[in-house]
Swiss-Prot record:
Organism: Pseudomonas putida (strain GB-1)
Keyword DNA damage set for record: yes
Protein name stated in the entry: DNA ligase B
Classification of source organism: Bacteria, Pseudomonadati, Pseudomonadota, Gammaproteobacteria, Pseudomonadales
Keywords, ordered alphabetically: DNA damage, DNA repair, DNA replication, Ligase, NAD
EC number(s) from the headed UniProt entry: 6.5.1.2
Function: Catalyzes the formation of phosphodiester linkages between 5'-phosphoryl and 3'-hydroxyl groups in double-stranded DNA using NAD as a coenzyme and as the energy source for the reaction.
Length: 566
């Protein structure tokens, strides 16, 4: 996980913010409770990962959660947490400490880091687990997990099964390397497939007592550090290739400009590769002697991570949208977050049942992704607020296909949805009559039914805030067009359960008199739809609407003229 790399403070200061960084308006007691709960969750994640090799949460959600904890501690003057690497520390000292890496927040931070530097190299940031490899007389004899950077655990028991790792050098020399053990993949495109839990899989395998040969063969090695190697990066890479580590040279590119680094970052992000990566590493070709390395991020190496696939967002409110048919859709309004350059402020929860199952309340921290790279999707709750705020959800039984034909209390949303559907492209196709217009008219008390807008005049429209004389004239023109719209557009706009391509015959009176059996003689109308049609035409509110439309002279709603006997 990313917390194998940095101490919490450095981590927080160098990770890009996915959520707004303003301090919450909390009491000290609430801040302490929220921070304590978040710390407990992070500690549990750390212990599972470091001791069992089990990742309970996606790496980037861990990153953002750790960042949020430090942010809260800074906001409220709380004591900083102990190093998240405490549980990773093992009994074996590394010959040379693992340094870790600073994370650069954005392109501007990368530009600042590169300013004035020469001899910069870029590499993919392999998404695996770091280790020290010790060769004696050309033979790999010891494998030590990164641990806390100073001491790690002994993974040497797995060496015989690591068939894809160079275990015998072409020369009988002593060698100490640092690198990334990663999951070998086939044609993996990071931008499409994400991390594929590659890091967690490798960590889980290495935490086992024993690997099978097949399991061991799924683990590869990328060497990124040769503490006592040649001074120049190009020389180190060339010699590593000769020693049996060609990937180090193949995936290391010298760059002169920010644009060069950005181009390679984009290339590796979208190209098929045999490994997962979560960004790129920028490193200087020259570095201090290994004797000066420390278990913290140095000046000569930095990471520029890929965009988040999931963002951690705080729920501000949950509101319930009632549609024309009575379907209730909970909408989570969140503290703005950014995914793939898209600013997200709200996300649909799909259904009332899903909201109830997730039990999302204001203050909860949720994971948000982009479905199809465009539509925000709430994946799950990551952290629950300590204080569970009550929410008043609409009663499911109150709203259905034949409810809310007037804006009575609790019916405003569905009523406005009905008007919007009526005037929209599915119905009358009236210009300038979106939900905002209908809401203003309803709030002003000018529209209290599905038809009284037909009687409005310019004087009353201009009394509504936000409606000018020009807007009033345009609305009246739209309303006037409604009078000449065909009967089938009115019928569909009012919500009659008929298909878009169904050929209608007869007027309102004839249709209202049909039985379910008679409706079933019409092509493409089955038992269920026929019952819905009978229920629609029999509804008292719908009959009242038809009567008012007949009085307004709308085609199809007036009864046929009586036949005169000769």
């Amino acid at each position: 996980m990313p917390y194998l790399l940095l101490f919490a403070m450095l981590f927080a200061l160098n990770t890009p913010l996915a959520w707004a960084a303003s301090c919450p308006d909390w009491t000290p007691q609430k801040a302490e409770a929220e921070a304590a709960q978040l710390q407990a969750t992070l500690t549990g994640w750390d212990e599972h990962y470091h001791r069992q090799g089990i990742a309970l949460v996606a790496d980037e959600l861990y990153d953002q959660s750790r960042q949020r904890l430090v942010h809260l501690q800074q906001c409220f003057g709380l004591a900083p947490s102990p190093s998240p690497l405490t549980s990773a520390r093992g009994p074996l000292p590394h010959p040379v400490p693992h340094t870790g890496v600073d994370k650069l927040a954005d392109r501007q931070a990368v530009a600042r880091w590169m300013a004035g530097k020469t001899g910069v190299w870029v590499q993919p940031k392999f998404d695996g687990v770091a280790a020290s490899l010790i060769y004696r007389q050309g033979q790999l004899v010891q494998l030590i997990s990164r641990g806390d950077g100073l001491q790690g655990h002994d993974w040497s028991r797995h060496i015989p099964q690591l068939g894809a790792v160079t275990r015998q050098l072409p020369q009988a020399i002593d060698l100490h390397l640092q690198g990334e053990l990663y999951l070998r993949l086939n044609e993996h495109v990071q931008a499409k497939a994400g991390s594929a839990n590659a890091r967690g899989t490798v960590a889980g395998l290495l935490a086992r007592k024993q690997l099978t040969r097949e399991q061991g063969n799924t683990i590869g090695l990328f060497v990124w550090g040769w503490p006592h190697g040649p001074e120049r990066q190009a020389d180190r890479l060339a010699q590593l290739a000769q020693l049996g580590f060609p990937d180090s040279q193949h995936y290391s590119i010298a760059v002169d400009t920010l644009e060069d680094a950005a181009r390679w970052r984009e290339h590796w992000y979208r190209s098929p590769l045999p490994f997962a990566s979560d960004g790129v590493i920028l490193r200087l070709g020259s570095r201090p002697p290994a004797e000066r390395w420390q278990a913290k991020a140095p000046y000569w190496i930095a990471a520029w991570k890929y965009p988040y696939v999931q963002a951690l967002a705080e729920v501000r409110d949950v509101r319930f949208r009632v549609g024309r048919t009575g379907r209730i859709t909970p909408i989570a309004h969140v503290q703005p977050v950014t995914l793939d350059d898209r600013r997200i402020t709200q996300v649909s929860l799909g259904s009332l049942a899903r909201w109830q199952a997730l039990d999302i309340r204001p203050g909860d921290q949720v994971a948000i992704s982009l479905a199809g790279l465009t539509i925000p999707r709430l994946e799950h709750v990551v952290h629950r607020a300590v204080e569970r705020q009550p929410l008043g959800a609409p009663a499911p039984g109150r709203h259905h296909a034949l409810s809310c034909w007037q804006p009575s209390e609790g019916c405003e949303e569905q009523f406005i949805a009905r008007l919007t559907w009526l005037s929209g492209k599915q119905g009358l196709a009236l210009p300038r009559t979106g939900p905002g217009t209908w809401r203003r008219l309803v709030d002003a008390g000018l529209v209290t039914s599905m038809t009284d807008w037909l009687q409005l005049d310019a004087e009353r429209l201009q009394q509504v805030p936000g409606i000018s004389s020009l807007t009033a004239a345009q609305l009246l023109g739209s309303f006037d067009q409604a009078r000449s719209r065909p009967f089938d557009q009115w019928l569909r706009g009012l919500g009659a359960p008929i298909g878009k391509h169904l050929q209608l015959t007869g007027g309102w009176q004839e249709m209202a008199s049909r039985s379910a059996g008679q409706w079933q003689t019409v092509p493409d109308i089955g038992v269920k739809r026929s019952r819905q049609l009978v229920g629609f035409f029999a509804a008292a509110e719908v009959q009242a609407i038809a009567t008012r439309l007949a009085e307004s002279g709308i085609e199809g709603f007036s009864p046929p003229p009586e036949r005169i006997e000769q």
